C-alpha cells in the first residue's frame, strides 16, 4: 500500500524490508529512498562488505534500523541463511526487493554452462526462492515483492545472453 509523502510523492508503507544486492549502486539508492524512522531494512550483500557497512552508517543516522547479511545468491544454503537472519531480526516481512543480479557478457556462440547456471541461479532461482520464503513470513495483506529487471527484457540483443534469459524469466515470475 502507499500513502502521499509531504512532497506529494508516493511512498511505500512497508516497514520491514529485505533488499538483495543493496550495498552498492541501485540497491543502495533504493535503501536510502525507503529509509527513515520506524523502518527496518535487511541489506544483503555478497562481496561489498565495506560498502554495506558504510551504507548502514548513513541509514542509521536517519533512524533506520539496518541489519547486514552476507550471502552468495547462487548457493541454496546462503539463501536459507538470509531468510533465517531476516526473520530473526524483522520477525515478519512487508517488502522484498529482488535487486541483486549477475551481469556478464556472453552470447549464443560463447556462453558456458558455468556462466549460464550462475546467471540463472542469481537472477532467477534466488528471487523465486526468496519470494516463496517471503510469502511464508508476511503479516496482513499489504505486502510488496519488487523484482528489478531492465530494458534488455524488452529490447533484445544477442549480447548478455545468459543475463537476458535469466531476467526474462524473472519478468515472467513477476
Model-flagged regions — what are they?
Residues 23-24:
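Conserved glycine-rich cofactor-binding loop
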Residues 39-53:
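Conserved glycine-rich Rossmann-like NAD(P)H-binding loop of the short-chain dehydrogenase/reductase
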Residues 15, 92-93, 137-151:
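Active-site loop of short-chain dehydrogenase/reductase
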Residues 49, 70-82, 113:
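The beta1-alpha1 cofactor-binding region of Rossmann-like NAD(H)/NADP(H)-dependent oxidoreductases
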Residues 107-108, 115-120:
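Substrate-binding pocket helix/loop in short-chain dehydrogenase/reductase
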Residues 99-104:
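Conserved NAD(P)H cofactor-binding loop of Rossmann-fold oxidoreductase domains
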Residues 144-169, 174:
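Catalytic loop of short-chain dehydrogenase/reductase
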Amino acid at each position: 500500500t502507499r500513502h502521499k509523502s509531504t512532497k506529494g510523492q508516493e511512498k511505500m508503507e512497508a516497514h520491514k524490508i529485505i533488499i538483495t544486492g543493496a550495498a552498492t549502486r541501485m540497491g543502495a539508492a533504493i535503501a536510502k529512498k525507503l529509509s527513515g524512522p520506524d523502518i527496518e531494512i535487511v541489506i544483503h550483500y555478497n562481496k561489498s562488505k565495506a560498502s554495506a557497512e558504510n551504507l548502514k552508517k548513513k541509514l542509521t543516522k536517519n533512524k533506520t534500523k539496518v541489519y547486514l547479511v552476507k550471502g552468495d545468491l547462487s548457493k541454496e544454503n546462503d539463501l536459507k541463511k538470509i531468510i533465517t537472519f531476516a526473520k530473526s531480526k524483522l520477525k515478519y516481512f512487508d517488502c522484498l526487493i529482488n535487486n541483486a543480479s549477475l551481469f556478464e557478457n556472453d552470447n549464443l556462440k560463447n556462453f558456458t554452462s558455468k556462466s549460464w547456471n550462475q546467471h540463472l541461479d542469481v537472477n532467477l532461482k534466488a528471487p523465486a526462492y526468496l519470494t516463496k520464503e517471503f510469502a511464508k513470513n508476511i503479516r496482513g495483506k499489504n505486502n510488496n515483492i519488487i523484482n528489478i529487471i531492465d530494458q534488455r527484457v524488452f529490447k533484445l540483443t544477442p549480447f548478455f545472453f545468459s543475463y537476458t534469459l535469466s531476467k526474462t524469466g524473472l519478468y515472467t515470475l513477476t
